């Protein structure tokens, strides 16, 4: 039974909705430790994150057992903290994935869950809360709730300002989200300032040619594209494409060499791998398909640039073991190369990609 009866709740105990913190009227029947104000929020949370972590919440929201020694108690506490850290990262990754897929409503419960565990583990004033605030801000922007997004961003900014040990990666995320806020408000001057800072801090943390830096270049390119400064936009889109090409081509070349032997020491086929988590894969799809759409709108002027992005997508989906998508983009690249009568070497390179895909024995996912 999902309904909560008020008289059955111990006196002084307040049960709150997992999504909005209003007084709870329902409980999840599967875990019995998660509460909701109504069916709408229960379904929203279930579809977003709760289904994936339902049983994992039970040991975190029930009393710790009695331990016979201090050593056992410390071990139990360490296990509890490890579970919390795992759920922080898991919920964060899922929320990021939803955002890159444009599912802003679904991202909110997952981001709230990540924030909730961060507060319990690190406290209310910790800089560790900032990534979760930024997820909630980005989700709010996607839903058109600019005032709410500003509140989350200012909370994140204030936390960073108070911190003495904030990482370059966190500074990068903060400036990227501030850039997105000002893009939504059509204040492109401020947006460019924050995205430039995003690129700087990301470069300090990961390097100028890292895929984690490419997001800043991409958003900056979008600003120049909207401002009709097409040469600047083109340069930055090319930069982003080259970063992703270098990353994916490295994985692709390693895999191609491995396939010469076909089998590993255990007699199993080598598995394709992008080296990315779910959120990064979703980000790659969003960035590369956006650039492809722009390239295709001007493919008559620079077909090589369109083919270059198509080849990146071929490698990406091949590494994801999605042969049908890889073949689709490969055929589009080959068709465009023939249509534009590009050199034979370009066509043969695409043919090699298609040949490797056609001999791949992995199932389509």
From Swiss-Prot:
Ranges annotated as MYND-type zinc finger: 17-54
Residues binding Zn(2+) 2: 28, 31, 50, 54
Recorded GO CC terms: sperm flagellum
Record's keyword terms, sorted: Cell projection, Cilium, Disease variant, Flagellum, Metal-binding, Repeat, TPR repeat, Zinc, Zinc-finger
Cellular compartments annotated: Cell projection, Cilium, Flagellum
InterPro entries: TPR-like_helical_dom_sf, Zinc_finger_MYND_domain, Znf_MYND
Expression by tissue: Expressed predominantly in the testis.
GO annotation terms (biological process): flagellated sperm motility; sperm axoneme assembly
SUPFAM superfamilies linked: HIT/MYND zinc finger-like, TPR-like
Ranges of the TPR repeats in the UniProt entry: 172-205, 214-247
Residues the record lists as binding Zn(2+) 1: 17, 20, 37, 41
Pfam families reported in the protein's UniProt record: zf-MYND
Record-level Gene Ontology MF annotations: zinc ion binding
Purpose: Required for sperm flagellum function and male fertility.
Disease note: Loss-of-function variants in ZMYND12 may play a role in male infertility characterized by severe asthenozoospermia with over 5% of the spermatozoa displaying flagellar abnormalities such as short, absent, coiled, bent, or irregular flagella.
Record protein name field: Zinc finger MYND domain-containing protein 12
Organism: Homo sapiens (Human)
């Amino acid at each position: 039974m999902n309904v909560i009866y008020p008289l059955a709740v111990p006196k002084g105990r307040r049960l709150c909705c997992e999504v909005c913190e209003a007084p709870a009227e329902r409980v999840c029947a599967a875990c019995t430790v998660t509460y909701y104000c109504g069916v709408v929020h229960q379904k929203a949370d279930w579809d977003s994150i709760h289904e994936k972590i339902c049983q994992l919440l039970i040991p975190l929201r029930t009393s710790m057992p009695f331990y016979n020694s201090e050593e056992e108690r410390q071990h139990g506490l360490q296990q509890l903290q490890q579970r919390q850290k795992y759920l922080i990262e898991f919920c964060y990754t899922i929320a990021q994935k939803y955002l890159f897929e444009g599912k802003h409503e679904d991202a909110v419960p997952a981001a709230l869950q990540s924030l909730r565990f961060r507060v319990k583990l690190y406290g209310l004033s910790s800089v560790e809360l900032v990534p979760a605030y930024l997820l909630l801000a980005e989700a709010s922007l996607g839903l058109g709730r600019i005032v709410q997004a500003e509140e989350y961003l200012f909370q994140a900014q204030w936390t960073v300002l108070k911190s003495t040990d904030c990482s370059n990666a966190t500074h990068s995320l903060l400036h990227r989200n501030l850039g997105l806020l000002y893009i939504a408000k059509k204040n492109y001057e401020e947006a460019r300032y924050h995205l430039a800072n995003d690129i700087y801090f990301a470069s300090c943390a990961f390097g100028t040619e890292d895929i984690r830096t490419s997001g800043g270049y991409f958003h900056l390119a979008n600003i120049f594209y909207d401002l009709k400064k097409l040469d600047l936009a083109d340069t930055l889109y090319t930069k982003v494409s080259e970063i992703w090409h270098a990353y994916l081509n490295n994985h692709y070349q390693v895999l191609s060499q491995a396939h010469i032997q076909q089998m590993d020491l255990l007699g199993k086929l080598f598995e394709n791998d992008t080296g990315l988590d779910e959120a990064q894969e979703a980000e790659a799809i969003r960035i590369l398909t956006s650039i492809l759409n722009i390239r295709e709108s001007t493919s008559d002027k620079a077909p090589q640039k369109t083919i270059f992005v198509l080849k990146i997508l071929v490698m990406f989906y091949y590494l994801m073991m999605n042969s049908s998508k890889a073949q689709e983009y490969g055929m589009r690249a080959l068709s465009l190369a023939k249509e534009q009568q590009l050199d034979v070497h370009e066509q043969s390179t695409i043919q090699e990609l298609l040949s490797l895909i056609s001999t791949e024995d992995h199932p389509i996912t």
